[in-house]
Amino acid sequence: MEKKTLSLCPICLKRIPATILEEDGKIIIKKTCPEHGEFKDIYWGDAELYKKFDKYEFIGKIEVTNTKVKNGCPYDCGLCPNHKSTTILANIDVTNRCNLNCPICFANANKSGKVYEPSFEDIKRMMENLRKEIPPTPAIQFAGGEPTVRSDLPELIKLARDMGFLHVQLATNGIKLKNINYLKKLKEAGLSTIYLQFDGISEKPYLVARGKNLLPIKQKVIENCKKVGFDSVVLVPTLVRGVNDNEVGGIIRYAAENVDVVRGINFQPVSFTGRVDEKTLLEGRITIPDFIKLVEEQTDGEITEEDFYPVPSVAPISVLVEKLTNDRKPTLSSHQHCGTSTYVFVDEDGKLIPITRFIDVEGFLEIVKEKIEEIGKSKMHDVKVLGEIALKLPSLIDLDKAPKSVNIKKIIDLILSVLKSDYSALAELHYHMLMISCMHFMDAYNFDVKRVMRCCIHYATPDDRIIPFCTYNTLHRQEVEEKFSIPLEEWKRMHKIGGEDDREDY
């Protein structure tokens, strides 16, 4: 197996040809920069799983672009006509200020000496740009820096809701959420989900990555969410070899113990920046198959490789909903090697039961594809299509293996409601399960233009661009932040901030 693509030189960031090939049971990316020499990285830690995920490839399409093709991908973001996926989740960095000073971070205002903080009106315009997409961007995440250091965050959340975003998410370290009244204020403003930085269940990951033990704060946030009835938290561990890769199972168990408020976990393997020697890179790289193996080992086989699917495996469901409603829908058309997930139910005794153990997922996806073809050929009425699916669904469920706590009829009803384009049913369906996922964002070493073109997680910027996640962080972030930043000392004078090290304010 050998594929040709384009990548980046990790040193000069120039676009260079690359080859993706199988080597010793793994998928490797190799490339040569005329100036800086050869580079080799692990693209995918298991060749067989790579091939299995390949069959779920789904090419999307976009109708609205903001930039023209001039220099070619990944320099023309965006979105440019080369892109293949509309925005599913948009990030807006509302500030680069932070109330932490993490050893591994070099991008916050304290380290850079500059403050990037778009105004309320800037952010409103960025959100308007996102809603102009076809279909309009459904979900938005306020990020940073640490977004909770902005005093107008509740107003931004309310504005997003008023503008029609179905899902408003907050990426946070959780420090300010230990204040229960502040949490209540965010909930009242319309916050949907807390995307909580959560590096592990022991002190070590926090001491290494954050410089202090933040675990008690994370636990306090979960406790506060229970008190105020905020029941949508996603734990977000940055996965680092030798730091917290031994805590994957423990994090999953912790989420299961708090499944009344924790909706899921999204593991993110660490990215590499700067000059990294090949030995360090190959030994430290965690790919999606590596993550899956860690899950299987550390859950004692309760969750296995067979339970995980690539993100675009569900894209045909969106296509069917589009055909039934005659309306464009957001489609998870990311590259098949960008992310993976599974859903598990937590039984009464705490046992983890993946949905694949009692529902024939492949069978359901086949039915969906069949109905898409039938609608295309015969213009079947939506009621008839849904009726036929409803008749077939029970045969895909093994009641003997289903968790006792699960109301199967309710699950079937919710699935049918989702096919009718009922977003509230989709949200309720998630409340019955725990999502376990992994998104492997790229860096300059494993960068693949073909993956970037299919990205559906984007950044909105003050210059009316919408930029894929991995190109923003690898290429465009510095340019955008420099263009729209002011010196830290000037910002402090403008806001009458004093003191040398006021972590609560910057």
Swiss-Prot record:
Query: Radical SAM core domain: which residues?
Result: 82-300
Q: Which Pfam families match?
A: Fer4_12, Radical_SAM, Zn_ribbon_HMPTM
Please name the InterPro entries in this protein's record: Aldolase_TIM (IPR013785), GDGT/MA_synthase (IPR034471), Methyltransferase_Class_D (IPR034474), rSAM (IPR007197), Zn_ribbon_HMPTM (IPR056488)
What, per the annotation, is the impact of changing C77A? Loss of C9-methylation but C7-methylation is still observed
Can you tell me which residues bind [4Fe-4S] cluster 2? Answer: C98, C102, C105
User: Which SUPFAM superfamilies has this protein been placed in?
Assistant: Radical SAM enzymes
Question: What are the GO BP annotations of this UniProt entry?
Answer: methylation
Pathway(s) per entry: Cofactor biosynthesis; 5,6,7,8-tetrahydromethanopterin biosynthesis
Top EC class of this enzyme: transferase
- What's the record's note on cofactor binding? Binds 2 [4Fe-4S] clusters. The clusters are coordinated with 3 cysteines and an exchangeable S-adenosyl-L-methionine.
In the record, the note on similarity to other proteins reads: Belongs to the radical SAM superfamily.
Its function, per the record, reads: Catalyzes methylation of 7,8-dihydro-6-hydroxymethylpterin, likely using methylenetetrahydromethanopterin as a methyl group donor, via a radical-based mechanism.
Q: Give the protein's recorded name.
A: 7,8-dihydro-6-hydroxymethylpterin dimethyltransferase
- Originating species: Methanocaldococcus jannaschii (strain ATCC 43067 / DSM 2661 / JAL-1 / JCM 10045 / NBRC 100440) (Methanococcus jannaschii)
